[in-house]
Amino acid sequence: MTSGARSIVDPKICNGRRMIRRTKIICTIGPATASYDKLKAMKKAGMDVARINMSHATQRDALKIIRWVKKLNHNTLFPIAVLLDTQGPEIRTGEISDPMNLATGDIVSLSVRDDRFVEQNSIMVNYDELVDVVKVGGTITVDNGLINFKVLEKDSNKLTCEVLDGGTLGSRKHVNLPGIRVNLPAITGKDLSDIEFGCENDVDYIALSFVRKPEDVLELKRLLASKRSRAGVVAKIEDQEGVTNVNRIAALSDGVMVARGDLGIET
């Protein structure tokens, strides 16, 4: 373990009595805070856990943070834990050469990514089962809910949609399918590489994104056991399926995080 930080107790003085703060403060470490001095100041201010978001950080970035935390934890009563947060499976729009300006009422088509299928006002999506799972009358949200579509009709390879909330669409924007059970792996190839990296560097926790069912947690636990890692498992609840199964997921996890952004869109 990086720090033994899973048993942190942080005594504070309140009304002349020594108190134990049970609520932990988790801080996401980004470009503005990724330095030894900044981490030291954050620890002094009360940070308990340094979160590394692997959706944005490289393994090289993460290794620097882990080493700084280990240095801070040397000979300290209250060590910081390191939490490695996986990117998880994602549905995204494709690459486009120029941003698309979408106005409310515009008609566009959404299709599974295919370089052979090109038409004006067509948006490619990297989820093979898109056309199969979305129903006419359903909604699709893009770019964290900034752009919304209503499905008007569908055929074998595309969805014809009306823009409900317009905006400027760029490349590789996040797509949500509210209320739909998606068929995506619990642990992607990138996640596997990042988890193995975390095990090699003794992180304290692995946060698994888009946990939908108890089997997702068990899959991660088997992987950690195979690497002889003692890292705790934090399950991130990000869609309706995860909410439905949250009690069984929580029973298998060391912690649960509610991803309010994605969950707010999905539900």
Where are these regions (language model features)?
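Non-catalytic helical/linker scaffolds that mediate oligomerization, partner binding
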Residues: 4-267
